[in-house]
Protein backbone atom coordinates (compact mmCIF):
# COMPACT_ATOMS: atom_id res chain seq x y z
CA UNK A 1 0.00 0.00 0.00
CA UNK A 2 2.82 2.40 0.90
CA UNK A 3 4.39 1.73 -2.50
CA UNK A 4 1.16 2.65 -4.29
CA UNK A 5 0.94 5.96 -2.38
CA UNK A 6 4.52 6.84 -3.28
CA UNK A 7 3.87 5.99 -6.94
CA UNK A 8 0.73 8.18 -6.93
CA UNK A 9 2.62 11.13 -5.43
CA UNK A 10 5.34 10.83 -8.09
CA UNK A 11 2.77 10.89 -10.90
CA UNK A 12 0.83 13.90 -9.56
CA UNK A 13 3.84 15.95 -8.39
CA UNK A 14 1.74 18.77 -6.85
CA UNK A 15 3.97 21.12 -4.85
CA UNK A 16 2.70 21.55 -1.31
CA UNK A 17 2.87 25.37 -1.55
CA UNK A 18 0.80 25.38 -4.75
CA UNK A 19 -1.81 23.18 -3.14
CA UNK A 20 -2.09 25.60 -0.22
CA UNK A 21 -2.43 28.59 -2.56
CA UNK A 22 -5.19 26.86 -4.51
CA UNK A 23 -7.12 26.23 -1.32
CA UNK A 24 -6.69 29.81 -0.11
CA UNK A 25 -7.67 31.39 -3.41
CA UNK A 26 -11.04 29.62 -3.39
CA UNK A 27 -12.08 31.68 -0.36
CA UNK A 28 -14.93 34.07 -1.19
CA UNK A 29 -16.89 36.69 0.68
CA UNK A 30 -20.24 35.19 -0.31
CA UNK A 31 -21.52 35.26 3.28
CA UNK A 32 -20.56 38.88 3.86
CA UNK A 33 -22.63 41.89 2.84
CA UNK A 34 -21.13 45.22 1.82
CA UNK A 35 -22.90 48.48 1.12
CA UNK A 36 -22.35 52.22 1.20
CA UNK A 37 -23.64 55.53 -0.05
CA UNK A 38 -23.21 57.03 -3.48
CA UNK A 39 -19.86 58.84 -3.77
CA UNK A 40 -18.38 57.53 -0.53
CA UNK A 41 -15.43 55.31 0.45
CA UNK A 42 -15.88 52.05 2.35
CA UNK A 43 -13.55 49.33 3.59
CA UNK A 44 -13.64 45.67 2.59
CA UNK A 45 -11.48 42.67 3.51
CA UNK A 46 -8.22 42.87 1.60
CA UNK A 47 -7.83 40.53 -1.35
CA UNK A 48 -6.04 37.28 -0.50
CA UNK A 49 -3.64 37.57 -3.41
CA UNK A 50 -2.92 41.29 -3.12
CA UNK A 51 0.11 43.02 -4.57
CA UNK A 52 3.00 43.81 -2.25
CA UNK A 53 2.50 47.58 -2.60
CA UNK A 54 -1.29 47.58 -2.22
CA UNK A 55 -2.61 50.05 0.36
CA UNK A 56 -4.03 48.03 3.26
CA UNK A 57 -4.86 48.68 6.90
CA UNK A 58 -4.57 46.37 9.91
CA UNK A 59 -7.70 46.36 12.06
CA UNK A 60 -9.08 44.22 14.88
CA UNK A 61 -11.21 42.50 12.24
CA UNK A 62 -8.28 41.71 9.96
CA UNK A 63 -6.54 43.34 7.00
CA UNK A 64 -8.76 45.77 5.08
CA UNK A 65 -8.53 47.88 1.95
CA UNK A 66 -10.47 50.94 0.86
CA UNK A 67 -12.69 51.13 -2.20
CA UNK A 68 -14.65 54.03 -3.68
CA UNK A 69 -18.29 53.89 -4.66
CA UNK A 70 -19.45 55.74 -7.79
CA UNK A 71 -22.14 58.38 -7.92
CA UNK A 72 -25.41 56.60 -8.78
CA UNK A 73 -28.92 57.77 -9.63
CA UNK A 74 -30.60 54.69 -8.14
CA UNK A 75 -29.69 51.85 -5.79
CA UNK A 76 -27.26 49.59 -7.59
CA UNK A 77 -25.27 46.42 -6.87
CA UNK A 78 -21.83 46.53 -8.43
CA UNK A 79 -18.59 44.58 -8.23
CA UNK A 80 -15.73 46.53 -6.70
CA UNK A 81 -12.45 44.67 -6.88
CA UNK A 82 -13.26 41.20 -5.49
CA UNK A 83 -16.63 41.79 -3.76
CA UNK A 84 -20.17 42.79 -4.63
CA UNK A 85 -21.32 46.06 -3.06
CA UNK A 86 -24.74 47.67 -2.86
CA UNK A 87 -24.44 51.39 -3.60
CA UNK A 88 -27.31 53.32 -2.04
CA UNK A 89 -28.76 56.28 -3.94
CA UNK A 90 -28.73 59.59 -2.08
CA UNK A 91 -30.98 62.56 -2.80
CA UNK A 92 -28.40 65.35 -2.86
CA UNK A 93 -30.89 67.91 -4.15
CA UNK A 94 -30.42 70.26 -7.08
CA UNK A 95 -28.59 73.46 -7.94
CA UNK A 96 -29.73 76.11 -10.44
CA UNK A 97 -27.33 78.76 -11.67
CA UNK A 98 -27.48 81.45 -14.32
CA UNK A 99 -24.49 82.31 -16.51
CA UNK A 100 -24.82 85.52 -18.49
CA UNK A 101 -22.17 84.59 -21.06
CA UNK A 102 -24.15 82.19 -23.26
CA UNK A 103 -20.95 81.13 -25.07
CA UNK A 104 -19.93 79.33 -21.87
CA UNK A 105 -23.23 77.45 -21.73
CA UNK A 106 -23.76 76.42 -25.35
CA UNK A 107 -20.23 75.84 -26.58
CA UNK A 108 -18.95 76.69 -30.04
CA UNK A 109 -17.13 73.97 -31.97
CA UNK A 110 -13.81 75.58 -31.05
CA UNK A 111 -14.61 75.78 -27.34
CA UNK A 112 -15.98 72.23 -27.33
CA UNK A 113 -12.79 70.97 -28.97
CA UNK A 114 -10.74 72.86 -26.38
CA UNK A 115 -12.80 71.44 -23.50
CA UNK A 116 -12.45 67.91 -24.88
CA UNK A 117 -8.68 68.29 -25.20
CA UNK A 118 -8.39 69.63 -21.66
CA UNK A 119 -10.57 66.82 -20.35
CA UNK A 120 -8.17 64.31 -21.91
CA UNK A 121 -5.23 66.06 -20.21
CA UNK A 122 -6.92 65.77 -16.83
CA UNK A 123 -7.77 62.12 -17.45
CA UNK A 124 -4.13 61.43 -18.32
CA UNK A 125 -2.92 63.11 -15.12
CA UNK A 126 -5.24 60.85 -13.11
CA UNK A 127 -4.20 57.65 -14.88
CA UNK A 128 -1.02 56.93 -12.94
CA UNK A 129 -0.66 57.44 -9.18
CA UNK A 130 2.56 57.29 -7.19
CA UNK A 131 3.19 54.54 -4.65
CA UNK A 132 5.93 56.61 -3.00
CA UNK A 133 3.38 58.52 -0.92
CA UNK A 134 1.11 56.71 1.53
CA UNK A 135 -2.03 58.79 2.18
CA UNK A 136 -3.23 59.09 5.76
CA UNK A 137 -6.78 60.08 4.68
CA UNK A 138 -6.73 62.62 7.54
CA UNK A 139 -7.72 65.57 5.36
CA UNK A 140 -7.95 69.20 6.40
CA UNK A 141 -10.06 71.80 4.59
CA UNK A 142 -8.14 73.58 1.81
CA UNK A 143 -9.81 76.92 2.64
CA UNK A 144 -11.75 78.05 5.74
CA UNK A 145 -14.87 79.09 3.78
CA UNK A 146 -18.29 77.50 4.19
CA UNK A 147 -19.75 75.07 1.66
CA UNK A 148 -21.74 76.93 -1.00
CA UNK A 149 -22.53 73.93 -3.21
CA UNK A 150 -22.22 70.40 -1.82
CA UNK A 151 -21.28 67.19 -3.60
CA UNK A 152 -23.86 65.38 -5.71
CA UNK A 153 -26.38 68.10 -6.53
CA UNK A 154 -28.08 67.84 -9.92
CA UNK A 155 -27.12 71.00 -11.78
CA UNK A 156 -29.22 73.18 -14.05
CA UNK A 157 -27.41 75.91 -15.97
CA UNK A 158 -29.67 78.59 -17.42
CA UNK A 159 -32.54 76.16 -16.92
CA UNK A 160 -30.89 73.30 -18.80
CA UNK A 161 -29.95 70.05 -17.02
CA UNK A 162 -26.24 69.36 -16.74
CA UNK A 163 -24.13 66.68 -15.07
CA UNK A 164 -24.24 66.32 -11.29
CA UNK A 165 -21.88 68.49 -9.22
CA UNK A 166 -19.33 65.87 -8.13
CA UNK A 167 -17.16 68.29 -6.18
CA UNK A 168 -17.37 70.68 -3.24
CA UNK A 169 -17.62 74.45 -3.69
CA UNK A 170 -16.14 76.45 -0.82
CA UNK A 171 -16.65 80.17 -0.34
CA UNK A 172 -13.60 82.40 -0.54
CA UNK A 173 -12.72 85.92 -1.61
CA UNK A 174 -10.26 86.39 -4.45
CA UNK A 175 -6.78 86.00 -2.99
CA UNK A 176 -7.74 83.70 -0.10
CA UNK A 177 -4.88 81.18 0.41
CA UNK A 178 -5.53 77.57 -0.59
CA UNK A 179 -3.55 74.89 1.26
CA UNK A 180 -2.88 71.24 0.51
CA UNK A 181 -5.39 69.20 2.55
CA UNK A 182 -2.99 66.25 2.50
CA UNK A 183 0.60 65.65 1.43
CA UNK A 184 0.81 65.37 -2.35
CA UNK A 185 2.78 65.82 -5.55
CA UNK A 186 1.78 68.40 -8.16
CA UNK A 187 0.96 66.41 -11.31
CA UNK A 188 -1.02 68.93 -13.37
CA UNK A 189 -1.22 72.69 -13.76
CA UNK A 190 -3.38 74.28 -16.45
CA UNK A 191 -5.65 77.13 -17.48
CA UNK A 192 -8.83 75.44 -18.68
CA UNK A 193 -12.12 76.46 -20.28
CA UNK A 194 -14.41 75.18 -17.53
CA UNK A 195 -12.19 75.23 -14.45
CA UNK A 196 -9.84 78.13 -15.15
CA UNK A 197 -6.50 77.97 -13.34
CA UNK A 198 -6.42 74.37 -12.17
CA UNK A 199 -4.06 72.26 -10.07
CA UNK A 200 -4.06 68.52 -9.32
CA UNK A 201 -2.25 66.84 -6.42
CA UNK A 202 -1.42 63.13 -6.35
CA UNK A 203 -1.64 61.88 -2.76
CA UNK A 204 -0.58 58.35 -3.66
CA UNK A 205 -2.27 54.98 -4.22
CA UNK A 206 -5.00 56.34 -6.49
CA UNK A 207 -5.97 59.32 -4.33
CA UNK A 208 -5.99 62.71 -6.12
CA UNK A 209 -7.43 66.15 -5.45
CA UNK A 210 -8.16 69.00 -7.85
CA UNK A 211 -8.45 72.76 -7.25
CA UNK A 212 -10.23 74.96 -9.79
CA UNK A 213 -10.99 78.62 -10.58
CA UNK A 214 -7.79 79.77 -8.85
CA UNK A 215 -6.47 83.31 -9.32
CA UNK A 216 -2.85 82.26 -8.80
CA UNK A 217 -0.89 79.02 -8.46
CA UNK A 218 2.01 79.08 -5.99
CA UNK A 219 3.68 75.74 -6.80
CA UNK A 220 5.36 74.13 -9.80
CA UNK A 221 4.77 70.88 -11.65
CA UNK A 222 6.55 68.07 -9.80
CA UNK A 223 6.67 69.86 -6.43
CA UNK A 224 6.05 67.75 -3.32
CA UNK A 225 3.75 69.72 -1.02
CA UNK A 226 3.32 68.90 2.66
CA UNK A 227 -0.10 69.02 4.30
CA UNK A 228 -1.14 72.65 4.98
CA UNK A 229 1.44 73.98 2.50
CA UNK A 230 0.10 76.85 0.37
CA UNK A 231 -0.62 75.87 -3.23
CA UNK A 232 -2.45 78.92 -4.57
CA UNK A 233 -5.15 81.56 -4.17
CA UNK A 234 -8.92 81.50 -4.59
CA UNK A 235 -10.15 83.13 -7.78
CA UNK A 236 -12.94 83.33 -10.33
CA UNK A 237 -11.29 81.99 -13.48
CA UNK A 238 -13.02 79.70 -15.97
CA UNK A 239 -16.80 79.23 -16.03
CA UNK A 240 -17.99 80.67 -12.72
CA UNK A 241 -20.66 82.92 -11.24
CA UNK A 242 -18.32 84.30 -8.58
CA UNK A 243 -15.09 83.61 -6.65
CA UNK A 244 -14.88 80.27 -4.86
CA UNK A 245 -12.81 77.08 -4.69
CA UNK A 246 -14.12 74.11 -6.65
CA UNK A 247 -12.53 71.12 -4.86
CA UNK A 248 -12.71 67.63 -6.38
CA UNK A 249 -11.37 64.42 -4.83
CA UNK A 250 -10.76 61.24 -6.82
CA UNK A 251 -10.06 57.84 -5.29
CA UNK A 252 -9.88 54.38 -6.77
CA UNK A 253 -11.24 55.59 -10.09
CA UNK A 254 -14.25 57.55 -8.81
CA UNK A 255 -15.04 61.08 -7.67
CA UNK A 256 -15.85 60.96 -3.96
CA UNK A 257 -17.45 63.38 -1.51
CA UNK A 258 -14.76 65.75 -0.13
CA UNK A 259 -17.02 66.88 2.71
CA UNK A 260 -16.86 63.41 4.26
CA UNK A 261 -13.06 63.35 4.16
CA UNK A 262 -12.60 66.40 6.39
CA UNK A 263 -14.65 64.96 9.25
CA UNK A 264 -12.65 64.26 12.42
CA UNK A 265 -11.52 60.64 12.70
CA UNK A 266 -12.63 59.90 9.14
CA UNK A 267 -10.31 56.96 8.43
CA UNK A 268 -11.19 55.15 11.66
CA UNK A 269 -14.88 55.68 10.93
CA UNK A 270 -14.74 53.65 7.72
CA UNK A 271 -12.35 50.87 8.75
Regions found by a protein language model. Give the residues of each.
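Catalytic cores of peptidoglycan-degrading enzymes
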Residues: 140-271
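Non-catalytic extracellular/periplasmic "stalk"
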Residues: 31-146, 150
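Sec-dependent signal peptide recognition
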Residues: 13-20
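N-terminal secretory signal peptides that target proteins for export/translocation
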Residues: 1-12
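Sterically constrained small-residue positions within well-ordered secondary structures
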Residues: 21, 33-35, 48, 69, ...
